[in-house]
From Swiss-Prot:
The keyword DNA damage does not apply. The keyword 4Fe-4S does not apply. Pfam families: Ribosomal_S20p. NCBIfam families: S20. It comes from Methylobacillus flagellatus (strain ATCC 51484 / DSM 6875 / VKM B-1610 / KT). GO terms for cellular component: cytosol; small ribosomal subunit. This is Small ribosomal subunit protein bS20. One of its GO terms (molecular function) is small ribosomal subunit rRNA binding. GO terms for biological process: translation. Belongs to the bacterial ribosomal protein bS20 family. Residues 7-19 have a biased composition (Basic residues).
Length: 87
């Protein structure tokens, strides 16, 4: 339990920040799912355009340190490889 005024304020800020980070993580998951759905549809050009639109979301969330930059790079690499594997 936060006893000092400073600790109470930091606790309030942590709650708000946690909610904000959760919304950003949700946006990341949605962007990744959109790309996967486009890949599973089998249309390479559509999948590539969806990838190009959503890769900035992945990068932005990594820049804000919501996820590690290597995790963002791993997602982008695997999704890009899946698109390239389409015939």
């Amino acid at each position: 339990m936060a006893n000092s005024a400073q600790a109470r304020k930091r606790a309030r800020q942590a709650v708000k920040q946690r909610a904000h980070n959760a919304s950003l993580r949700s946006a990341l998951r949605t962007a990744i799912k959109k790309i996967i759905k486009a890949v599973e549809a089998g249309d390479k050009t559509a999948a590539q355009s969806v990838f190009n639109e959503n890769v900035s979301v992945i990068d932005r969330i990594a820049d804000k340190k919501i996820i590690h930059k290597n995790k963002a790079a791993r997602h982008k690499s695997r999704l890009s490889a899946a698109i390239k594997a389409l015939a």
